[in-house]
Amino acid sequence: MEKNYFKKIIARDANGLQVISACCSDSKVKIEDIKFLKKNKIFLLLIERIKKEKKSEEKLKSIIKFEYIASVKSKNINQNNNSDILELLGIDLFRDKKNYNISIYFKNNAFITLSSEILEVTLEDQSEQ
């Protein structure tokens, strides 16, 4: 009997974030599944991703959780159309004087930029489809 283990990857540096980005590239995200919990300083993406670790076409529901987020900016994303689906291309990290700027890139030149003093990002698988 094969056991199913769901992954949980925690990134606290640029290398860890690259691993999460690689696992999540080509994922689908509904606009309604993007949430910023300002009071808790948490930004969430519920994604449908392909399980690249096993080189299969198996699809998973996963959550990418960004913690300690001070601000969120987006461009070329129509937030009024909740049913639109974005395709995630990758996640990148830039550092200025005291903050991390995390850029989440989607197809069609859409992106979200998160600002945080501390880098902590978690990718956690929720269920197989």
What are these regions (language model features)?
Residues 1-129:
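Surface-exposed, interaction-prone regions used to assemble/regulate multi-protein complexes
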